[in-house]
Amino acid sequence: MYSPAWVKDAIFYQIFPDRFCRSERYKAVGKFVPWGSKPTRENMFGGNLAGIEDKLEYIKGLGVNAIYLCPIFKSNSNHRYHTVDYFEIDPVLGTLEDFDRLVKKVHKLGMRIILDGVFNHCSRGFFQFNSLMELGPNSPYVDWFHVKGWPLNAYSGKPNYECWWNFPALPKFNTNCADVREYLFSVAEYWTRRGIDGWRLDVPNEIDDDSFWQEFRRRVKEINPEAYIVGEIWDAPERWLQGDQFDGVMNYVFRKAVMQYLFDENAISTEEFCKRLQAAFPEGRGDMPMNLLGSHDTTRLKSQPCTSWERIKFALTLMFFMPGAPCVYYGEELGMLGGKDPDNRRSVPWEKLPEMQKEPVYTLVKELTAMRNGNPVLRDGKMEIACDGESFTVTRTLGKKKMTLAVSLAENEPQFEIR
């Protein structure tokens, strides 16, 4: 299968917009909690697109060359996975002009930017769903959702319509409806034409229809053949990687193996880890995964059970050594703490930046981005894993060039070297 050429050279940085940076250049109407407050599922910090633009030089300075933005469309939630309007930037974040300026500056700095597409479900505030609540079965949008009874029970008791994981705030689209499909495809086309470099697709497996994603791919690639389409798939991804749907997946299979080997009290063996590592990067598949150790859905590295500096150091080094595009979750380079959602979505303490840049992980991330950017073998080379008891090697080979990560467990702490 073909993946966009630029992705093999990409190092992604994931941003949760509400918590990244709040610039005073943009004044949103509304009341926000003080920056640095404890995150909850409901509170809003007021991070904005201008704040992201203000920090692009910082991001570029890490050695990163691609940004993955969590949802930015109009929504009534801090994470914005409850979409109200797919064609409008959330006014808390900024304006369409702010978005265009951000994309332009990202590209001027030689970086790429992909957006989060939430196409399985929307918000109760979505216009067409509101029409059903007002007009019932007489709504012209009655076929847009999976309704089981009238009137809609959207705010009390058990919902009588299909919704994501039975959350009434997230009504599920009926993607068998031609009008729904066309609407969602037009969303993808609109933002692709505005200059983004691809899509991260939220829970795409919930749209259990290959033809939907095949058409999605065709529409996006017709506008930008080099757009990167990456799906949030937590388990075996082969179905989605036949060359006609996604270019890659978020490599949660890799992440799970690393967590169970390094950060679990009941750790798997080195032999089992090597098997799982190989399974996460099968030879000959040809896709371009997004490799990650943390995201807005997971506990941060520094807050994991059994965490230690040596384990974090090895985990990050391994991620940058593997095929695919590594992705750093915002603040991971600063050693930010964070347990389960919503604690893993804390605001970046920019006022403490000089102090936090002294964290060894900050230096490590810059060293790893430099290593990957400076060695084509880590971006294009074939991979081989060899296991011997409690030791193993990962070797990348490109022509006559070879790099090897040699690892052993000494007193349960990973010891490794690159040669």
What are these regions (language model features)?
Residues 4, 8, 28-32, 78-90, ...:
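Aromatic- and acidic-residue-enriched segments that line the glycan-binding/catalytic groove
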Residues 11-14, 67-69, 113-115, 199, ...:
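Hydrophobic faces of well-ordered beta-strands that scaffold small-molecule active sites
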Residues 15, 59, 69, 86, ...:
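Conserved, mostly hydrophobic/aromatic
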